[in-house]
């Protein structure tokens, strides 16, 4: 953690001191962020001993401070919103309990590039070209959202919040073969809901977003997406009309499809088995017991 001035450090310290009270009084006691326990004042002594990692907790709090420019009131407002949403929506269930439509799972890919540049090691891919004739998959916005959140949560498990070189994710949106397609109202609703959800509940996690194979869909895809995001996020966007130019930015991506050094296909690179954190597993198991009772 690097503070630019004394004020930033003071805001961070104030948040750390107030966290227990904030969670207890404003978040219904829900103490989990991205699969990690963030407060040592909540829960039993055994839970704290087993699942609380101070370095990770502080790194996550620092991300929140950075996301909201070290404005204490803004940070608290968004932290409360995020934790209450996580308790209600249960994104850990999306990733590690629920079964999603197989056709959707073929569109969302997760890759791990250990030798890649900092914060380009965990990459989520959205292969929109595979959905050209599958518009029915967008009819149920909530089903689509839960699938996409599940992919996001799995990707987060591959991050290391104690490592500044692997504490952000990269995304790729591939629009190959989508040139004659038009975004209907159902897809617009899904795209808007996903973007709004990521903006609101996953701050300071995106390192870069690449839009590839987009010459003819630029107007309706990229421009629409830009409308839904803030300026800081837009600065992380890179648009490539040729998919093979992606290899310049992600050197370990598939060579045949994206110009990288790998001989594997994107589907062969797909990381399908991701383990939740010990704390996430504990919460999911506890939920199962509560559901049975």
UniProtKB/Swiss-Prot annotation:
Membrane protein topology class: Peripheral membrane protein
UniProt domain CRAL-TRIO: residue ranges: 100-266
Subcellular location: Cytoplasm; Endoplasmic reticulum membrane; Microsome membrane
Top-level taxon of the source organism: Eukaryota
InterPro entries: CRAL-TRIO_dom, CRAL-TRIO_dom_sf, CRAL/TRIO_N_dom, Sfh5
Known cofactor(s): heme b
PANTHER family: PHOSPHATIDYLINOSITOL TRANSFER PROTEIN SFH5
Role description: Non-classical phosphatidylinositol (PtdIns) transfer protein (PITP), which exhibits PtdIns-binding/transfer activity in the absence of detectable PtdCho-binding/transfer activity. Regulates PtdIns(4,5)P2 homeostasis at the plasma membrane. Heme-binding protein that may play a role in organic oxidant-induced stress responses.
Protein name (database record): Phosphatidylinositol transfer protein SFH5
Organism: Candida glabrata (strain ATCC 2001 / BCRC 20586 / JCM 3761 / NBRC 0622 / NRRL Y-65 / CBS 138)
Gene name of the record: SFH5
């Amino acid at each position: 953690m690097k503070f630019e001035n004394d004020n930033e450090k003071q805001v961070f310290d104030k948040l750390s001191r107030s966290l227990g009270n904030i969670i207890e009084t404003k978040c219904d006691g829900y103490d989990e962020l991205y699969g990690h326990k963030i407060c040592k004042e909540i829960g039993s002594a055994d839970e704290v001993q087993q699942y609380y990692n101070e370095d990770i907790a502080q790194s996550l709090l620092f991300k929140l401070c950075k996301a909201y420019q070290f404005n204490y009131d803004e940070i608290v407002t968004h932290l409360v919103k995020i934790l209450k949403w996580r308790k209600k929506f249960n994104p850990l269930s999306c990733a590690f309990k629920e079964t999603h439509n197989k056709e959707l799972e073929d569109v969302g890919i997760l890759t791990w590039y250990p030798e890649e540049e900092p914060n380009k090691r965990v990459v989520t891919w959205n292969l929109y070209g595979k959905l050209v004739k599958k518009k029915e998959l967008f009819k149920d916005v909530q089903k689509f959202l839960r699938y996409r959140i599940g992919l996001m949560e799995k990707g987060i498990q591959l991050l290391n919040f104690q490592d500044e070189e692997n504490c952000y994710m990269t995304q790729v949106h591939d629009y190959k073969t989508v040139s004659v397609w038009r975004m209907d109202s159902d897809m617009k609703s899904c795209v808007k809901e996903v973007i709004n959800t990521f903006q609101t509940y996953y701050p300071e996690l995106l390192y870069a977003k690449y839009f590839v194979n987009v010459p003819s869909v630029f107007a309706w895809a990229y421009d629409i997406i830009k409308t839904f995001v803030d300026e800081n996020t837009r600065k992380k966007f890179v648009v490539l009309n040729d998919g093979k130019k992606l290899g310049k930015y992600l050197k370990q991506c598939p060579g045949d499809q994206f110009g990288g050094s790998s001989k594997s296909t994107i589907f062969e690179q797909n990381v399908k088995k991701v383990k939740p954190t010990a704390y996430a597993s504990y919460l999911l198991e506890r939920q199962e017991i509560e559901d049975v009772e």
